[in-house]
Swiss-Prot record:
It comes from Arabidopsis thaliana. GO terms for biological process: cotyledon development; mucilage metabolic process involved in seed coat development; positive regulation of DNA-templated transcription; regulation of DNA-templated transcription; regulation of secondary shoot formation; seed coat development. One of its GO terms (cellular component) is nucleus. A zinc finger (Dof-type) spans 21-75. InterPro entries: Dof, Znf_Dof. Transcription factor that binds specifically to a 5'-AA[AG]G-3' consensus core sequence. GO terms for molecular function: DNA-binding transcription factor activity; sequence-specific DNA binding; zinc ion binding. The keyword Metal-binding applies. Keywords: DNA-binding, Metal-binding, Nucleus, Transcription, Transcription regulation, Zinc, Zinc-finger. It holds the Pfam family Zn_ribbon_Dof. Zn(2+) binds at C23, C26, C48, C51. This is Dof zinc finger protein DOF4.2. It is found in: Nucleus.
Length: 194
C-alpha cells in the first residue's frame, strides 16, 4: 500500500478516505481530509492548508471571513517584560504630579500647651500622641500666612515646594510640630519624626 488513505473504525471495518476537494472559500486545491462529521460517511470534514479553514463537504458554509482563524501558535508573540515596563513607566509618569497642591482639607486643634502635630493630613495634640513637647524643627511657617478656616491648605503659599516633598525618604512618616511664641511672632514649626 503506497497511500495511507485507508483507516479502520471501532468495528475494524476498512474505510477509504475521500479524495481531496477544492476549498469553497479560497478555491485552493491544497486541502486534506480531517474526519467524518458525526461518524457519517456522507459528511466528510476537510481543512484547507491555504486559508486554514475547515468545512463539511456538502454542508452549508457559515458566514466566516475568508482570512479565517489563526492557530494560537501563529499569533504574534508579546514580550511580557516590555509590556510591564511600559505600564510601569506610565504609572510613574502619572504619579510624578506634585501632590495636586494639597486639595484636601486639614483640620486643626491646638491644646492648652500649644503643642500641635500633623498625623497624615490632620493635626492632633502632640503630647497625647508622642509625649514630646520640645524638639528640633526642620521647617517653620509664620502663623499669619496660615488660614485655619474651612479653605484648603495650598502648598505653594507656604514655602513647601514640590522638590521638598518628592524624593524625601521621610515623607511617608508622621510629621510632628509645635507652635512657638517667641518675640510675639507666631510660628508653626514642623519636624519629621523617625
Amino acid at each position: 500500500m503506497n497511500n495511507l488513505n485507508v483507516f479502520t473504525n471501532e468495528d475494524n471495518e476498512m474505510n477509504v478516505m475521500p479524495p481531496p476537494r477544492v476549498c469553497p472559500r479560497c478555491y485552493s486545491d491544497q486541502t486534506r481530509f480531517s474526519y467524518f462529521n458525526n461518524n457519517k460517511k456522507s459528511q466528510p470534514r476537510y481543512k484547507c492548508k491555504n486559508c486554514c479553514r475547515c468545512w463539511t463537504h456538502g454542508g452549508v458554509l457559515r458566514n466566516i471571513p475568508v482570512t479565517g482563524i489563526c492557530d494560537k501558535s501563529n499569533l504574534p508573540k508579546i514580550d511580557q517584560s516590555s509590556v510591564s515596563q511600559m505600564i510601569l513607566a506610565e504609572i510613574q509618569q502619572g504619579n510624578h504630579q506634585p501632590f495636586k497642591k494639597f486639595q484636601e482639607n486639614i483640620s486643626v486643634s491646638v491644646s492648652s500647651s500649644s503643642d500641635v502635630s500633623i498625623v497624615g493630613n490632620h493635626f492632633d495634640d502632640l503630647s497625647e500622641l508622642h509625649g514630646i513637647t520640645n524638639s528640633t524643627p526642620i521647617r517653620s511657617f509664620t502663623m499669619d500666612r496660615l488660614d485655619f478656616g474651612e479653605e484648603s491648605f495650598q502648598q505653594d503659599l507656604y514655602d513647601v515646594g514640590s522638590n521638598d516633598l518628592i524624593g524625601n525618604p521621610l515623607i511617608n512618616q508622621s510629621i510632628g510640630g509645635y507652635v512657638d511664641n517667641h518675640k510675639d511672632e507666631h510660628k508653626l514649626q514642623f519636624e519629621y519624626e523617625s
